[in-house]
Amino acid sequence: MSAPVCTIAVIVPVHNAAKYLPDCLDAIAAQQFDDFCCVLVDDGSRDESPLLCDNMAAGDARFTVIHQPQRGVSAARTAGLRRALEIGAEWIAFCDADDLYHPAFLSTLYKAVQETHLPLACCRYDTFADALPAEAAPPAAVKRLDGPAHLDALLHDHAVDYGLWNKLYSATLLTPAMLDNDLAYNEDLLANWQAFCAAPGCAFCDWPGYHYRQHADSASRRGLPPQSLDDQRRAAALIRGSVPGRWPVLQQSANAFYYEKLVYLASMILRRADIEPYRVQLGELRIGITAGLNDRQLGRNPQLPFAIKVSAWATVHAPKLWRKVCRKYLKDRQ
């Protein structure tokens, strides 16, 4: 079946998601905005996901399927983007195979970019485990984040978030190289940073249009692989070193983000029962945190939250006490 031409292409990377995939596909099919196509990328699934994808494409011409050997979520998104660009989609959206769109997700974000004439829009998201939250009405107004405020929001506003899935992008903003960036963690943050840098601003819809499912198999709820620490630190360093020259005021924000990431990653290790596997990473993080304590661009950065400054001091000067605090009060999260 040839892929349909559409205004918006929704890209869904799929890997062993049969338990949740039908709900995800139903939510996409039920979108109030009808001029879309959906590229399902089966990334070497070994459950019923390939069959579910094929059945959906056979029954709804808006859906098309790519089957490929398992190469990871970034490679799957990249394959989907290549297909979307080949068929001439004007706008790109993403959805994870275990999550759900609000019925007005595409229509609301598309309306936002049309009204603001910006190449990028995003909305808030909510989380659910079993019962889906009540669907909120789309917002009456859209907030315009002109540069560099949109980049500052990407780094520091959890409503904007790092994810690719709560956003709508002009196809001119994204390239395959942005998505396949050699990171297994925070790959979406780095891709968003590059896309946001290429955009003059972002339309923000203060409304939970994306439903993020929390379950034991979620990537965000797994353990703490050493690569996660390395990739997150690398992403933050790349961001810090690539602030657009036209927005030099953003450098302070990027520096604060980098230092906060160091402190956060150290706390991720310290809250674990066994920190021995992370001795090397913890040592490197402590060196970076110590070096930045009295640096006006890092530990004394006015944009750095006070709680992070206290955490940085405790990491360096009261490590045993700080570990007890981390173990007792900080939730284990990715």
Please place each PLM-identified region on the residue numbering:
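A conserved acidic beta->alpha catalytic loop
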Residues: 34, 42-52, 70, 96
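Glycine-rich, basic loop-to-helix element that forms the pyrophosphate-binding segment
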Residues: 68-87
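Membrane-interface aromatic/basic loop that binds lipid-linked glycans or pyrophosphate carriers
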Residues: 115-118, 271-334
